[in-house]
Amino acid sequence: MWVPGAGIPSRLTLSAFTRAARFCVLNSGVARWKDVPAENCRGLYDFHTQLKPDVEFGKLSSRLYKSRSETKRYVTSPRVAETVVRVLRGKRKAGQLILECNPGPGVLTRALLESGARVIALESDKNFIPELKSLGNSVNGRLEVIYCDFFKLDPRNHGMVTPPVMTSDMLFQYLGVKAHPWKKGFPLKVVGILPAKTERNTLWKILHDLYSCSSVYKYGRAELNLFISEKECRKLTANPQTPALYQSLSVLGQTACGIKVLCTEPSSLFDTYAIKGELEKQRHRESLEQNLCFVQLTPHRNLFTGTLTPFNYDVFFHMLRQCFMKRNAKLIDHLPSLSPIDAVHILKQIKKKKDVRVVDMYPKDFLRLFETIECSKDDTCKWLYDEFMEDALS
């Protein structure tokens, strides 16, 4: 069984999996890692909490973040702010710590403070920071403002970074937040709006971070409460009852998290600002008619108590992507390209008929499929892969 802990790398190569000789080259049938010594795989379960030394934000440099014409959506309607506070108040304890992403003009920030919450405001636009800090001076230390973009935490392949781009280690060390055991949850809740132009990519990054226990999830089972476009929300919550919307993102999200749509609001109630704090009009009719759904993503406590771990999640991702490439095909037709194990035997193990299609499988069925192959007694070769999979895992 995997033991959650900090220090897990954000991406893992094939050589980092828990057993040698689990993969075969698709066309040649040669075990790619057959000759890798077993001792090379030792120690993968022995991670302990090891945070980086304290870092002074001002002394870091980066070429990754360049000021460009970005637009962000903000809560500017008092009614929406009151609704958010009301739906969050249900489970929230008095004095709950809220990490608010890109609060902008601070309408939601004020509502959260008035409800008794303590707020850490991560704002990526310097133009909003003076007013937010002024608000903080009037609430007896219950608001802290940091120049940071939550959705750009821990950029992949980064060197040294400078705010608003940060690493989660920099942020949480500064806040004094320590890593928590996975089953014990997390001491704060995250509230924000997904960036409109990179919404889907941001969702994928969140899922990668969650399954690999990296970024904010290295510190515990963080609950995200995010406004997401209704279009992406419907995909995230889709299942075999809505096959046209059902996809690998749906399975990954529902396998990892409890997903609740807390409320839905029209996009017209959210103002859009350019990166310089200037109000912009929503130009496209589609964006005006699109609703935003306030979605709660709560990672499951038992996500890593079975076969799935942060060391083999990449294979689970690949299995789903491969299956949904031909979503209406029969599962039995996909299995020979995924595993050398007899396809009929696998279907019997997961108690599915030979004519079951990919879009007929619920998230729990895909997880059972993954566990069945991963726990097979055939230790020499469980999964097949080709250059496509190698690219996906790199």
UniProtKB/Swiss-Prot annotation:
Pfam families: RrnaAD. Coiled coil: none annotated. Keywords: Methyltransferase, Mitochondrion, RNA-binding, rRNA processing, S-adenosyl-L-methionine, Transcription, Transcription regulation, Transferase, Transit peptide. It catalyses: adenosine in rRNA + S-adenosyl-L-methionine = N(6)-methyladenosine in rRNA + S-adenosyl-L-homocysteine + H(+). GO terms for molecular function: mitochondrial transcription factor activity; RNA binding; rRNA (adenine-N6,N6-)-dimethyltransferase activity; rRNA (adenine-N6-)-methyltransferase activity. Gene3D superfamilies: Vaccinia Virus protein VP39. S-adenosyl-L-methionine binds at V75, E123, D149. Residues 1-19 form a transit peptide. It is found in: Mitochondrion. S-adenosyl-L-methionine-dependent rRNA methyltransferase which may methylate two specific adjacent adenosines in the loop of a conserved hairpin near the 3'-end of 12S mitochondrial rRNA. Component of the mitochondrial transcription initiation complex, composed at least of TFB2M, TFAM and POLRMT that is required for basal transcription of mitochondrial DNA. In this complex TFAM recruits POLRMT to a specific promoter whereas TFB2M induces structural changes in POLRMT to enable promoter opening and trapping of the DNA non-template strand. This is Dimethyladenosine transferase 2, mitochondrial. It comes from Bos taurus (Bovine).
